[in-house]
Amino acid sequence: MNVGIDFGAVLAFGLLAKFDIDKQKELQTKVNEKMERKKEMKGASKTMKEREAILRSLPLEITVGVDGTTRTASVGELQAGAKQHIIIVTGPRKACTDALIGANLLKMDFAMSNILVVPYDMDSDSGERPSGGFGEKPSYETQPYIARPASDDWADYIKGEMNDAVKQSGEQARKEGIALVVANNGKVIRRGVGKVPWRQMVQQLENEVNPSPEGPLTWL
């Protein structure tokens, strides 16, 4: 009888010990995964900060006269000197076109809010993307608030942003396009995939330089 009781106790202890070990392994796995995610997020944050610095050095072609006269200036110069905010839209041609048509409805808001819109059509290679002048284009592509990438150096920057978007949102980012909202302090305050909510982004840029007590708007 005593032997039976002792055997049962040993068996129960063994099962409890195994359960405890399994739980410890599961907990350690979760801890390791959490640490790895934090490490990846820290690395991604560092990469994005480095990319912000690269963005400031990239040149844009802007319209400076009613006759269509253009000049070239870096993003950093436009931010520091003219206090310009920048919204970059990139993706396939259709995504860029849809975004520019939507932007055209708010063109007065862009003028009043010092916002430049930078379209980057990823369907075109560097040979097809014009480096100077606006040529014969639809009116929504030739508005004064439209700025054009003025060098091939933009390709690497856009590629990095798109790769990050694909990691977070899947391949739909390549199909639907992405938008980046850059305040005139050089900070990228919003990244989004798909249809561009222009009115909300204009308001968010206003909140960035003139914070309201209600806090920032959400990305729609």
Q: What are the functions of these language-model segments?
A:
Residues 1-220:
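Non-catalytic interaction/Regulatory regions outside core domains
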